[in-house]
């Protein structure tokens, strides 16, 4: 395998762009620290961090496989490994299978409840890329997929999935829909031409307003979560800081320019990190 092939596989898994892994990792860490009410078990923590990396990469591979015939018509994705011919469909599917197997082998070291829940996570990861052809709400499916690690984390750490886990699940799903709509705004013009559906297209001129409402819902539910779990004042300062980043994102997307919308999407990494700091500080201090 020559260097260009190695680089193509690296790009296919998005290892060169860790933003997706981080957006999946933050809520997983929220759940682990809340479930443990402090520092989670080290074995569980390592399994979930590695699982996030493997499954996010698997999701990117199956996404590019599903989009291989349309990516060449989109400015941002035309040079991806599959549409450019550097990697074949068979090679992509083989890599996807390897990544899923690696993830499942990690899960097998967890308890029975976690193993059972993992099957749903795999189905969601496979389903999401194909939703863009049948519904204008693929971001909703991504919200479910990116949130499924939350009940799994609670199951692994405490062998149960309490109501607070599902509240956190909803919070993260709403946040995911908001930031992935920002991401979809980048490709909206191209997607309309080639028949790809998204919430950015569905929301139309109400996109910024709906994103704002989703962000407000996230903040409100985070406050409810903090109240239910009696988290300390540090937690609420973190939520306030996250609100500031949401305001900044609204400012970025006000003109709907591609680069500004992508910058707003990337900014969500800070939101996830802030909430993690707020949660971990509250349960550890």
UniProtKB/Swiss-Prot annotation:
Q: What is this protein called?
A: 4-hydroxybenzoate octaprenyltransferase
Extract the InterPro entries matched here: HB_polyprenyltransferase-like, Prenyltransferase, UbiA_prenyltransferase, UbiA_sf
What gene name is given for the protein in this entry?
ubiA
Which GO biological process categories is it annotated with? ubiquinone biosynthetic process
Family affiliation:
Belongs to the UbiA prenyltransferase family.
NCBIfam families the record matches: ubiA_proteo (TIGR01474)
Q: How does it sit in the membrane?
A: Multi-pass membrane protein
Q: Where in the cell is it found?
A: Cell inner membrane
């Amino acid at each position: 395998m020559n260097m260009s092939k190695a680089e193509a596989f690296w790009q296919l898994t998005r290892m060169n762009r860790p933003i997706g892994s981080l957006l999946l990792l933050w809520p997983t860490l929220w759940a682990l620290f809340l479930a443990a009410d402090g520092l989670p078990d080290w074995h569980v923590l390592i399994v979930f961090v590695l699982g996030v990396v493997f499954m996010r990469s698997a999701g990117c591979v199956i996404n590019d496989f599903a989009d291989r015939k349309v990516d060449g018509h989109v400015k941002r994705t035309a040079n991806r490994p599959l549409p450019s011919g550097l990697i074949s469909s068979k090679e992509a599917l083989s890599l996807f299978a390897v990544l899923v197997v690696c993830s499942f082998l990690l899960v097998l070291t967890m308890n029975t409840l976690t193993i059972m829940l993992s099957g749903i996570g795999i189905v969601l990861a496979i389903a999401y890329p194909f939703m863009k052809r049948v519904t204008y709400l693929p971001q909703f499916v991504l919200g479910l997929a990116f949130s499924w690690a939350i009940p799994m984390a609670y199951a692994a750490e405490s062998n149960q999935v309490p109501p607070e886990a599902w509240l956190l699940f909803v919070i993260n799903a709403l946040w995911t829909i908001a930031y992935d709509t920002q991401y979809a705004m980048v490709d909206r013009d191209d997607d309309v031409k080639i028949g790809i559906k998204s919430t950015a297209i569905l929301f139309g001129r109400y996109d910024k307003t709906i994103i704002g409402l989703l962000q407000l819902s996230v903040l409100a539910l985070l406050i409810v979560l903090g109240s239910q779990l009696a988290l300390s004042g540090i937690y609420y300062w973190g939520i306030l800081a996250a609100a500031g980043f949401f305001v900044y994102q609204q400012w970025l997307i006000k003109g709907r320019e591609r680069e500004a919308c992508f910058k707003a999407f990337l900014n969500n990494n800070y939101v996830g990190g802030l909430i993690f700091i707020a949660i971990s500080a509250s349960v550890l201090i």
